[in-house]
Amino acid sequence: MKSPDSYNLNEILEYKEVSSLVWKWLSDVLSKFEEVIPNCDVPKIIEEANNCISTLNTITALSDQHILSHFIDRELYQDFIDWQSYKVTDLLDFCNFYSTLQSLSKSFLEVENELLD
């Protein structure tokens, strides 16, 4: 990530617009997984993960997600993009997907803190 001073206002506003959509989606997804994971119902967990990916595809189709790559780690951004064309088929896939979501959540918080400073 560049230093917050190196962004112009338009970049920051565009990032905030896209990140707020993704952040809302991410918050909903992580809450949903908190509900289904404790039940250890693997088919339900996989179904929810694929539903989440489908919803993500809708959200990103409506926005310029590329702006996120200017703010978050490039490797994490690429993982995020890769998941959009993927289908979760087993628990290992889900664990990798969930790990990416947690990293994305952490990254968004770090960016917000840096932009606020």
Regions found by a protein language model. Give the residues of each.
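Surface-exposed peri-terminal alpha-helical interaction modules
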Residues: 1-117
